[in-house]
Amino acid sequence: MEHNPKTILLVEDDVALNRAVVFKLEQKGHRVVSVFRAEEALEKLQSEHGNIDVVWLDLLLPGMNGIEFLAEIHKREDYKNLKVVICSVSGREESKGIARGLGAVDYLVKSDYEIDALVEKVLSYA
């Protein structure tokens, strides 16, 4: 259990990965707000009133995708300091550039990391 628990908004539609990440983060003493769609993430950002330390964001989501989510929060003043880390299966340079241009602090390709390393990397931004 960590001494400084963080709140992570997990936006991941892969059910198995979502559950595994929630388990790993909660095991470390962190609070996880888990959603499967970007639209739900926008609702959680409002209801959490600035309590989110970092967002784990998948790009390929049903409905609103990760880039559209980033574009939406990028234009809102109250989210200008929100740290968003992209965790995607896509390693396309174009996607990386767009995501960083919209304020993502990092872009991680899921296949490049074991789950524990992904979790630690995202937590490093919290």
Give the residues covered by each predicted segment.
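Conserved acidic carboxylate
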Residues: 12
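The feature encodes the CheY-like receiver
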Residues: 18, 62, 92
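Acidic, metal-coordinating helix/loop segments flanking the phosphotransfer/catalytic sites
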Residues: 34-54
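Active-site residues of response regulator receiver
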Residues: 58, 88
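Non-catalytic signal-transmission and effector/linker regions of two-component phosphorelay proteins
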Residues: 1-9, 116-126
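Acidic catalytic/metal-coordinating carboxylates
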Residues: 37, 65-71
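Charged docking surfaces used in two-component/phosphorelay signaling
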Residues: 19-27
